[in-house]
Design a protein with these regions (language model features):
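Enzymes that bind and transform nitrogen-containing heteroaromatic metabolites
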Residues: 1-146
Length: 146
C-alpha cells in the first residue's frame, strides 16, 4: 500500500476541508500515478473532488463512519477491518491511500511507500500528515527535480 499526498514544510495537508494549494504538475502526477489502480480515501476527501464524485479510471474505495452513506461508482466501507477484506484481491502495489488526514493516520502503518510532494512554504493548516522526516520508520530514497 502506498500513500500519495502533498504537504507544506510543516507537513500540513489542508485547511477547512481543502488542499492548501493546487499545483497542476502535482495533480497531473497524482492522476498519472493512480490511474488504473485502487484509491482509498475518506468521505470528506471524496466531497472535495469535482462534483464530489469518485475518480474516473480507478477503483475507488471510500471509508465512512456513516453506515447509511453510499455513493455511486465506489465501494463504501465502514472500518479498517472491512477495508482490508475488500482489498484482499488487490496487490499492495496497486493500492494508493489518498487522504484525508484521519485516513492517512489509520492506514500509514500499512504503507511501505509514500509519494510526497513537499511544498517549500508554510500555510495555515488544520490537517497534518505524520512528520516522516522525524520518523525512524521512514527514509527518503528518491527526490524529484521539482
Amino acid at each position: 500500500m502506498k500513500a500519495i499526498l502533498s504537504s507544506d514544510r510543516k507537513w500540513g495537508l489542508g485547511y477547512q476541508g481543502r488542499l492548501l494549494v493546487s499545483i497542476p504538475s502535482d495533480l497531473r502526477f497524482f492522476r498519472e500515478t493512480t490511474m488504473g489502480h485502487v484509491v482509498v480515501m475518506g468521505r470528506k476527501t471524496l466531497a472535495t473532488l469535482p462534483a464530489g464524485q469518485p475518480l474516473k479510471g480507478r477503483t475507488n474505495i471510500i471509508l465512512s463512519r456513516d453506515p447509511e452513506w453510499t455513493v455511486r461508482g465506489a465501494t463504501v466501507v465502514h472500518s479498517i477491518k472491512e477495508l482490508m477484506e475488500v482489498l484482499k484481491p488487490y496487490e499492495d502495489d496497486d493500492i494508493y491511500v489518498a487522504g484525508g488526514g484521519e485516513i492517512y493516520r489509520q492506514l500509514l502503518p500499512y504503507c511501505d511507500t509514500a509519494y510526497v510532494t513537499r511544498i517549500d512554504m508554510t500555510y495555515q493548516a488544520d490537517t497534518f500528515f505524520e512528520d516522516l522526516d522525524e520518523s525512524p520508520d521512514w527514509e527518503m530514497v528518491e527526490e524529484g527535480d521539482e
